A protein has these predicted regions:
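Binding-site signature for planar aromatic cofactors or substrates
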Residues: 4-136
C-alpha cells in the first residue's frame, strides 16, 4: 500500500513538473532486435490510473513498442545548462482513435491526414536526472 501511495505521489510531482516546465522531449525505443529509434515527443499525459501516456501515429516508435515494451523519455529543460529528466518506461497498454485520445490532444492541425492515432500508456520504472545517476 505504501509503495502505491509513493508511486502516485511521484507521478503527481512529475505531472506538476511537466505542467510548469518548458523544454524538449525525446522518446527512445528499440525493436526486438535492438535497433534503436529516437523521436521528438511532447510532454507526457498523466492518467488517474497512475500511468503516463503519449499520443503517437503508426510510425517507427509505435512499431518498436509492439515487440519491445521498454522506452526512455528524455526531457531537457529550456535555458542554459543541462537540467531535465530521464524517465524509464514500460508499455502497459494502448488504445486507438478513442475519445480519451482526442480529449488529450494539445494541438490540432488544419491539414492533418486522417491516420490512425494511438494513445500508449506506460508505467514509470525509474526516474533519473538528465545528467548523472541520481541519488545513491
Amino acid at each position: 500500500w505504501v509503495d502505491g501511495v509513493q508511486k502516485r505521489r511521484k507521478l503527481m510531482d512529475l505531472k506538476e513538473y511537466f505542467d510548469n516546465t518548458n523544454g524538449i522531449g525525446v522518446l527512445s525505443t528499440a525493436d526486438s532486435d535492438g535497433k534503436v529509434d529516437a523521436a521528438i515527443y511532447a510532454r507526457p499525459h498523466f492518467t488517474d490510473e497512475g500511468t503516463l501516456a503519449f499520443i503517437m501515429r503508426d510510425r517507427l516508435t509505435h512499431h518498436n513498442l509492439q515487440s519491445n515494451p521498454h522506452a526512455l523519455f528524455l526531457f531537457k529543460e529550456d535555458g542554459p545548462g543541462y537540467k531535465g529528466k530521464r524517465l524509464f518506461l514500460t508499455k502497459v497498454r494502448e488504445e486507438q482513435d478513442t475519445e480519451l485520445l482526442e480529449s488529450l490532444r494539445r494541438r490540432q492541425y488544419i491539414n492533418e491526414k486522417d491516420e490512425a492515432k494511438f494513445l500508449v500508456f506506460f508505467q514509470l520504472d525509474k526516474e533519473l536526472p538528465l545528467i548523472g545517476g541520481g541519488k545513491k
